[in-house]
């Protein structure tokens, strides 16, 4: 990792160059493929990793090879992962879902923006240089209609989004023919229902039951459909966002593209700086993944950062502003109730959630109940009109392992369960946010409590961090907890970067956090027994045993780091075909020795001889020691 510190100007110039030269880029020895659905415009992107053949015999002059089939993998990079697609962030991405949205004939363009704040920003000529030029005309459900994926699912309708997701979740494993690659250990799903083949009808059923959500605002047609639920692949969220003192619009767009390249299934824009509105527009128009926000952050900016001055009216205006821009899910801290705030007084670290602390301060200042709780039905009405999913925030999550699983945390969780049922009355999709800081032995209870009290709505957790002693390495401390809770049933994991508790992450931090959490999510998929999850592991192990170094690099989550580490000690091209690595050397490589043993056994027909001796042993009673007269 580079330790060179760039100035603010250099950072912005670097981001500008990145945007100016941005083009679709494939990973090493990979190509973009599309799996087609029942209609021409359902084209599901995947990345296919090409592998080299295996040497199976012959001699130096006439070697014999056996082909290794390519490995398809889930791909979140959208058009940025396709070298054949031209990229221009000033124009934004193609509107993939627009035909599907229009065909349902249940929404219409607005004649004007609903948000007073949006109108004021659009009228400000001084913002023209910052503004995204190709602004969409926002749509809203027509009177008497609901446009949510949950509503369609409950009506028995399988949408194109659901079919897209079913194809995507199967990860192209139907293309794999090798029995070696298809072998998989049985998992322990703790009640998860994992079918051998995910169908569009299964997707519809899970969404209808509230066990899964499809974050897909009708005003974000650029997004590629994805699903969050415990009966699907574990997903990973990346946080980006500027602040009052750091980062520019260019840098946030760069971080968005970078996040999708390294596997972010969703991205949360947590911007708190001056140009929140304009930054978000650039992000949405260029994002192939769902975008989430915490609207209270922007509402607070509108009252100059004074929590006591927040009002329902200002917050409502912010919801309308963001919904009409295309935000796919809102984190709403509606479970921080006035009566729960005193429960945090005896905590070691009190209230650590930014949104939770804002609402707690408002409640105490006015000695009134949380206005998000009081106006929750109105929030649901807004979400239903645009298909904004709700991520019910854990404002009272523990900020230290000492505070884990306490009265405040679980009281709020039960309230989130009550709010979930209210949201479902409006056909609004819901997921539940969770901790936080929790030692390993206390993690599973978080999952069981959530399933019981929140009616199996998808769980979305920050880690949890399993120890508090490792600032600078909290992507490790939390990755441990993330893998565990993902196995127990958590549907989406919010990444933690090395900068957690220390500062805002840069590009390299974002990558480190995402790789750590992709490992955690994949480990959880393996442990649950998600069909096909082990294919890539099997391909890697086969390549490793056969000393196919290039394939090992290319199958890795991070091919560049894998190659760089190998080349530190074996940089020559001959090192890429060597039947050993730098750790053991040529004479002590266990896999090389094993191959030699196999070759020797084959030549001497030892296996047949051993089988004959085994039969003879069993025929004599199977005893290791025999009396002399029996021998």
From Swiss-Prot:
Pathway: Cofactor biosynthesis; thiamine diphosphate biosynthesis
Record keyword Transcription present: no
Binding, substrate: 239, 268, 297, 333, 353-355, 394-397, 433, 460
Cofactor(s) this protein cannot do without: [4Fe-4S] cluster
Keyword terms, alphabetized: 4Fe-4S, Iron, Iron-sulfur, Lyase, Metal-binding, S-adenosyl-L-methionine, Thiamine biosynthesis, Zinc
HAMAP family named among the record's database cross-references: ThiC (MF_00089)
The protein's role, per its UniProt record: Catalyzes the synthesis of the hydroxymethylpyrimidine phosphate (HMP-P) moiety of thiamine from aminoimidazole ribotide (AIR) in a radical S-adenosyl-L-methionine (SAM)-dependent reaction.
Subunit structure: Homodimer.
Protein name: Phosphomethylpyrimidine synthase
Species this chain originates from: Klebsiella pneumoniae (strain 342)
């Amino acid at each position: 990792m580079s330790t060179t510190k760039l100035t603010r100007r250099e950072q912005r110039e670097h981001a500008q160059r990145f945007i100016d030269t941005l083009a679709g880029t494939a990973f090493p020895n990979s190509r973009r493929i599309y799996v087609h659905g029942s209609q021409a415009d359902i084209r599901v992107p995947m990345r296919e990793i090409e592998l080299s053949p295996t040497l199976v015999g012959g001699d130096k002059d006439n070697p014999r090879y056996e082909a290794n089939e390519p490995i398809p993998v889930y791909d979140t990079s959208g058009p940025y992962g396709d070298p054949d697609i031209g990229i221009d962030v000033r124009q934004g991405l193609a509107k993939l879902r627009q035909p599907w949205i229009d065909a349902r004939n249940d929404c219409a363009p607005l004649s004007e923006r609903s948000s007073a704040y949006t109108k004021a920003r659009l009228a400000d000529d001084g913002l023209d240089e910052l503004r995204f030029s190709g602004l969409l005309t926002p749509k809203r459900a027509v009177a008497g209609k609901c446009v949510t994926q949950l509503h369609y699912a409950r009506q028995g309708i399988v949408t194109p989004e659901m079919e897209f997701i079913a194809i995507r979740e199967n990860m192209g494993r139907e293309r794999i023919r090798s029995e070696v690659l298809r072998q998989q250990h049985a998992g322990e799903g703790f009640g998860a229902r994992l079918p051998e083949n995910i169908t569009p009808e299964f997707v519809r059923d899970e969404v209808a039951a509230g066990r899964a959500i499809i974050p897909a605002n009708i005003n974000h047609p650029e997004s590629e459909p994805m699903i969050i639920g415990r009966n699907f692949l574990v997903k990973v969220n990346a946080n980006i966002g500027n602040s009052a003192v750091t980062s520019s619009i260019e840098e946030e767009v760069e971080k968005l593209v970078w996040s999708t390249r390294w596997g972010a299934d969703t991205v949360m824009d947590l911007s708190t700086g001056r140009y929140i509105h304009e930054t978000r527009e650039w992000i949405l128009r260029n994002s192939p993944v769902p975008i989430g926000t915490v609207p209270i952050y922007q509402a607070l900016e509108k009252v100059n950062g004074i929590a006591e001055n927040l009002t329902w009216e200002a917050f409502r205006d912010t919801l309308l502003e963001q919904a009409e821009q295309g935000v796919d899910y809102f984190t709403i801290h509606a479970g921080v109730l006035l009566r729960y705030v005193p429960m945090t007084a005896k905590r070691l670290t009190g209230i650590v959630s930014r949104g939770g602390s804002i609402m707690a301060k408002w409640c105490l200042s006015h000695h009134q109940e949380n206005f998000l709780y009081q106006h929750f039905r109105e929030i649901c009405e807004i979400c239903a009109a645009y298909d904004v999913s709700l991520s019910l925030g854990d404002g009272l999550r523990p900020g230290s392992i000492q505070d884990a699983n306490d009265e405040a945390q679980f009281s709020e969780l039960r309230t989130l369960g009550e709010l979930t049922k209210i949201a479902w009355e409006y056909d609004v999709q819901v997921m539940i946010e969770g901790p936080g800081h929790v030692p390993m032995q206390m993690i599973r209870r978080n999952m069981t409590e959530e399933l019981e009290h929140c009616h199996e709505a998808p769980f979305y957790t920050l880690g949890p961090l399993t120890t508090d002693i490792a600032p600078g390495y909290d992507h490790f401390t939390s990755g441990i907890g993330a893998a565990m809770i993902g196995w127990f049933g958590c549907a989406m994991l919010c990444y933690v970067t090395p900068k957690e508790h220390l500062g805002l992450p840069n590009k390299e931090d974002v990558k480190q956090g995402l790789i750590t959490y992709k490992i955690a999510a994949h480990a959880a998929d393996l442990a649950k027994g998600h069909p096909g999850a082990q294919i890539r592991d099997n391909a890697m192990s086969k390549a490793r045993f056969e000393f196919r170094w290039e394939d090992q690099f290319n199958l890795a989550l991070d091919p560049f780091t894998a190659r760089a580490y190998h080349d530190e000690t074996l940089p020559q091209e001959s090192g890429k075909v060597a039947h050993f690595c730098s750790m053991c050397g040529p004479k002590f490589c266990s896999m090389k020795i094993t191959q030699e043993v196999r070759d020797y056994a084959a030549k001497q027909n030892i296996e047949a001889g051993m089988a004959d001796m085994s039969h003879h042993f069993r025929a004599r009673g199977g005893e290791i020691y025999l009396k002399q007269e029996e021998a």
